[in-house]
From Swiss-Prot:
Protein's name according to its UniProt entry: Histone H1.3
Record's subcellular location: Nucleus; Chromosome
Transmembrane segments: none
Keywords: Chromosome, DNA-binding, Nucleus
One Pfam family hit: Linker_histone
Length: 31
């Protein structure tokens, strides 16, 4: 159970990081 929760959290944070990177890249392109 614990390991499953940790992996789920890692996947969520990873997807969030990728989304943030995309937003940052888009912001740099528009500037």
């Amino acid at each position: 159970m614990v390991s499953e929760a940790i992996t789920a959290l890692k996947e969520r944070t990873g997807s969030m990081l990728t989304q943030i990177k995309k937003l940052v890249a888009a912001g740099k392109l528009t500037k």
